Amino acid sequence: MRVKFHTTGETIMTQDELKKAVGWAALQYVQPGTIVGVGTGSTAAHFINALGTMKGQIEGAVSSSDASTEKLKSLGIHVFDLNEVDSLGIYVDGADEINGHMQMIKGGGAALTREKIIASVAEKFICIADASKQVDILGKFPLPVEVIPMARSAVARQLVKLGGRPEYRQGVVTDNGNVILDVHGMEILGPDSDGKRHKCDSWRGDCWFVANRGADVALIGTPDGVKTIVK
């Protein structure tokens, strides 16, 4: 794993400015003439703004949410359905938490299922995040699980058996018409947690657990500049 810094000087930056810095830094991975996979959330929104400056150089984007689609279109970027695309060079998205193994918890923006699918198609996953998202142990941020509405109670009971404390995210319906359970108390130590991911899939819940696609490159916004971590 390689780490390097792109310094921004000693200027004190807000969290949003750190997100903006990594969003723009991700442009270096965008190749002209390609279709770009785009995530969802406040950090991804900064990347979309940056991508707008290259709209004449790329074919377009595949979006992970209705919100990102609307923003991309407002900037004049063509949005492809994933079914129209054979492959993606890169997928750029934020994270709720990322550990030293480049594994993440995602889904705070309730777009995790589409995010996971698009990331799985991409050759390279570029994670963009501010330094507050770096952790040693995943799980302080509750693990979002997307569930079909009729299975909410059944999935919640299974999550309790796994040691979690599921909380129904009231009033939230995903772009897929599903609901979200935020699971507290699920400390995830590292790659050996694979079994829990399979259980998550098997009872028709969907989550972005450690065993799912990790980042290939992480751009971390810090007070000292953008830190690049390459897996």
Curated annotation (Swiss-Prot):
Say which enzyme class the record assigns. isomerase
Q: Which residues does the entry assign to the active site, renumbered to this chain?
A: E115
Residues given in the record as substrate binding sites: T40, G41, S42, T43, D93, G94, A95, D96, K106, G107, G108, G109, K133
State the Gene Ontology BP annotations: D-ribose metabolic process; pentose-phosphate shunt, non-oxidative branch
One Pfam family recorded for the sequence: Rib_5-P_isom_A
Which keywords does this Swiss-Prot/TrEMBL entry list? Isomerase
User: What EC number(s) does this enzyme carry?
Assistant: 5.3.1.6
State a single Gene Ontology molecular function: ribose-5-phosphate isomerase activity
Q: Which InterPro entries match?
A: NagB/RpiA_transferase-like, Ribose5P_isomerase_typA_subgr, Ribose5P_isomerase_type_A
Per its UniProt entry, which superkingdom is the organism in? Answer: Bacteria
Q: Which SUPFAM superfamilies match?
A: NagB/RpiA/CoA transferase-like
What pathway is this protein a component of? Carbohydrate degradation; pentose phosphate pathway; D-ribose 5-phosphate from D-ribulose 5-phosphate (non-oxidative stage): step 1/1
Q: Which reaction does it catalyse?
A: aldehydo-D-ribose 5-phosphate = D-ribulose 5-phosphate
A GO cellular component term found in this entry reads: cytosol
What NCBIfam families does the database record attribute to this sequence?
Answer: PRK00702.1, rpiA
Q: What does this protein do?
A: Catalyzes the reversible conversion of ribose-5-phosphate to ribulose 5-phosphate.
User: What family is it from?
Assistant: Belongs to the ribose 5-phosphate isomerase family.
- Subunit field text: Homodimer.
| Name recorded for this polypeptide | Ribose-5-phosphate isomerase A
Origin organism lineage: Bacteria, Pseudomonadati, Pseudomonadota, Gammaproteobacteria, Enterobacterales
